[in-house]
């Protein structure tokens, strides 16, 4: 799949809207000492160019929660012909990065519903606090994804949808999924990886410590506070 030309960078307004949505998301911090986050990714051929960036993003997510408490992350990805893989739960960014570097992208159809269904099964075993999905395409039934997203909403598990590229059809469904689950949506491309890292770090902090931790995180240094103020304009 060829990469679309002239992809728009993520705008300040869009990033600000995303952070505002995160702040509105109900916090599920209860007695669990460690928040659990399912991190789903599209590993089909079209995402090969940006896969390496995902490793850096994972590392930053873990560092962002150092002062709050650990998070446990499970990596799930699909690729090729009906291949769907999940890692074990890990609180080590290095372990997940090592696993991700051993993954090569392969052409195939999207399997987003499998990630959603798997996350719901994990939740039935032990509560998860959020699901993150990063992808650029949608080749399955949008109504089914929205139905599953509604289940996440019932269980109060927000889905944070990150879209690479500018497909309007993908954007429409990703936004609906985020809305139905009580989560949030944000687009990105190769020119806005830094912003994506910051947003995913914010999600990780939210999972680890809730709204108060997120607010403190955004004000933890002047550079981050300035960025946040710019995003909310």
What is each model feature region?
Residues 155, 173, 180-181:
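Short, structured coil segments at secondary-structure junctions
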Residues 1-38, 45-52, 67-69:
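Acidic, polar low-complexity linker/tail segments
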Residues 129-130, 154-160:
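Short, surface-exposed connector motifs at secondary-structure boundaries
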Residues 39-44, 128-140, 163-165, 182:
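DG-centered beta-turn motif at the end of beta-strands
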Residues 32-88, 92-134, 138-143, 165-175:
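Von Willebrand factor
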Residues 181, 185-233:
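C-terminal "exit" segments of structured domains
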Residues 61-64, 147-155:
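Catalytic-core regions built around general acid/base machinery
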């Amino acid at each position: 799949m060829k990469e679309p030309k002239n992809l728009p960078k993520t705008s300040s307004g869009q990033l600000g809207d995303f952070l505002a949505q995160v702040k509105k998301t109900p916090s599920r911090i209860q007695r669990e000492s460690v928040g659990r986050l399912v991190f789903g990714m599209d590993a089909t051929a079209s995402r090969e160019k940006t896969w390496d960036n995902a490793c850096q993003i994972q590392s930053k997510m873990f560092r962002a929660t150092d002062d709050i408490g650990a998070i446990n992350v499970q990596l799930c990805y699909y690729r090729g012909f009906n291949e769907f893989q999940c890692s074990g739960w890990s609180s080590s960014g290095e372990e997940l990065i090592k696993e991700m570097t051993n993954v090569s992208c392969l052409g195939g159809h999207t399997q987003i519903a499998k990630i959603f269904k798997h996350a719901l099964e994990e939740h039935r075993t032990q509560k998860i606090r959020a699901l993150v999905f990063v992808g650029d395409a949608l080749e399955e039934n949008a109504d089914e994804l929205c139905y599953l997203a509604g289940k996440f909403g019932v269980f109060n598990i927000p889905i944070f949808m990150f879209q690479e590229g500018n497909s309007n059809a993908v954007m429409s469904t990703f936004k609906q999924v985020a809305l139905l689950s009580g989560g949030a949506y944000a687009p990105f491309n190769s020119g806005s990886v830094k912003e994506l890292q910051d947003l995913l770090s914010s999600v990780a902090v939210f999972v680890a410590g809730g709204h108060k931790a997120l607010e403190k995180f955004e004000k933890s240094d002047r550079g981050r506070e300035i960025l946040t103020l710019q995003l909310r304009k």
